[in-house]
Amino acid sequence: MEVIGYIETVDLPELGLFDLDAKIDTGADSSSIHCDEIIVEGDMVTFLLHDEVHPAYHGKKITLPIAKRSRVKSSNGKSEERIFIKIPIKLGCKTYDAEISLSNRENMKYPMLVGRRFMSHRYLVDVSHKYITKKGK
């Protein structure tokens, strides 16, 4: 298993995003990405990415197939239905497909959260360090 820190950069090649800061959260079941203006049309979803710190991320409109809809308990403890997309995430040396929920994370420090379902049997999290994978690049 690859060792990662509690904060890492990830690549989302299908969205054209690279070196995006992500919180690694073993307490969260699923992964999520910050977006808004989520519009569902049939089995497709269109959403707008926002992060003024990351120029390639800010104001980017994306349309993808819906992977699933599921109820998720948010950080404030409320349960809400979310739309999930399925795209590859590169974390460290490896790339794996992941289901990622679309969520407004504007009050969160990091635009992406990587949950334990993605990390299970692949990564070991060292919570005393961050950006471990960057050092190996």
Write out the residue ranges for each language-model feature.
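Pepsin/retropepsin-fold aspartyl endopeptidases
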Residues: 1-137
